[in-house]
From Swiss-Prot:
A molecular function GO annotation: C-C chemokine binding
Domain of life, per lineage: Eukaryota
GO biological process, one term: chemokine-mediated signaling pathway
PANTHER family linked: ATYPICAL CHEMOKINE RECEPTOR 1, DUFFY ANTIGEN/CHEMOKINE RECEPTOR
GO CC, any one term: recycling endosome
Compartments where found: Early endosome; Recycling endosome; Membrane
Protein name according to UniProt: Atypical chemokine receptor 1
Membrane topology value: Multi-pass membrane protein
Record family assignment: Belongs to the G-protein coupled receptor 1 family. Atypical chemokine receptor subfamily.
Cystine bridges: C45-C270, C123-C189
């Protein structure tokens, strides 16, 4: 994509003068098939990036707000008095806040306008933390929707640690393609997927499409199907599902961009390519904003949990039979 602040130098005026002096000696019918439109169509297509050098204040502001908001909600979740008032799966909410805080910390490193002597390992680490935390948050929300209330009631002991390690491990593996594809170019930490890493571009796009697009669609489809059939309430719907609104466009646009790059979809006009580039930038900006929105969503979940009664869950079969026995003896 091109850069609006530093456009490509246009010396067409000089070339046009030389061209007119050169062609004045030739008859008008010397180039019978010459078409000016064909020459313009063959010119390179330059897009104006929205997240260019001037977007550095946006990255810094989002980072500061995200760190402050995430730190505040973490302090509230870890308070001893508050943990007894929270009927939700508190460990999952804490992990979501930690993921949001980690993303907020590395946002300035990913900024377009932050130039300097960035080392490659720091760039790799920033992308690992950013996408690893994003994938982990998505998986945690899906896990919380399916098992959160049950785990909060203490009916699945010993499962939290294994699920936590597994989810964050899977998130780290899913972020490896973008980590290997990132590099420092002219002092900027960017994702290039150059050389032998070109294949990783499609793997990364597939991972984003699966986690940010297919996962929420699967949750919605399962919830709708179980509602129609009158089955169990799982997955439980809460305000945390709003989180996917910030990353759903990112998964869609990366998938579309991969189809265009692989020639599965042919973009024949420059305005269409420019529109796709703009959508990619808008989706990236919206995804970055999630680190500010996530603490607000967590605060709303905590408010609802502390002002409502704990969810009623079916008792296990063994516990029900034991209660019946006690009732018969009485």
């Amino acid at each position: 994509m091109g850069n609006c602040l530093y456009p490509v130098a246009d010396d067409n005026s000089t070339k046009l003068a030389i061209k007119e002096d050169f062609l004045i000696d030739f008859p008008e019918d010397y180039y019978p098939d010459y078409n000016e439109t064909d020459v313009e169509a063959a010119a390179p297509c330059h897009s104006c990036s929205l997240l260019n050098y001037s977007s550095l204040p946006f990255f810094i502001l989002v980072s500061i707000l995200g760190i402050l908001a995430s730190g505040t909600i973490l302090y509230a979740l870890l308070r001893p008095l508050f943990r007894w008032q929270l009927y939700q799966d508190r460990s999952t909410l804490v992990q979501l806040a930690v993921g949001s805080a980690l993303f907020s910390i590395v946002v300035p490193i990913l900024a377009r306008g932050l130039s300097g002597a960035l080392i490659t390992s720091l760039c790799h680490l920033a992308h690992l933390v950013a996408y690893g935390s994003a994938f982990a948050q998505a998986l945690l929300i899906g896990y919380h929707a399916c098992l959160g209330p049950q785990l909060g009631a203490g009916q699945v002991p010993g499962l939290r640690l294994g699920v936590t390690v597994g989810l964050w491990g899977v998130a780290a593996l899913l972020s490896l393609p973008v980590v290997l594809g990132s590099d420092t170019s002219q002092g900027l930490c960017t994702v290039t997927f150059s050389g032998e890493w070109e294949t990783l571009r499609y793997i990364h796009a597939a991972a984003c499409f699966a986690i940010f697009v297919l996962l929420p669609l699967g949750l919605l489809g399962t919830k709708g199907l179980k509602t129609v059939l009158g089955r169990a309430p799982c997955p439980w719907v809460d305000v945390l599902w709003v989180w996917f609104i910030f990353w759903w466009p990112q998964g869609m646009t990366l998938g579309l961009d991969s189809l265009v790059r692989s020639k599965a979809i042919v973009v024949s006009t420059c305005p269409a390519q420019q529109a796709l580039d703009m959508l990619l930038d808008v989706a990236e900006a919206l995804a970055i904003l999630h680190c500010v929105a996530t603490p607000l969503l967590l605060a709303w979940v905590c408010y609802q949990a502390t002002h409502t009664s704990p969810p009623s869950l079916p008792l296990p079969t063994t516990q029900t039979s034991h209660l019946d026995t006690l009732g018969g003896k009485s």
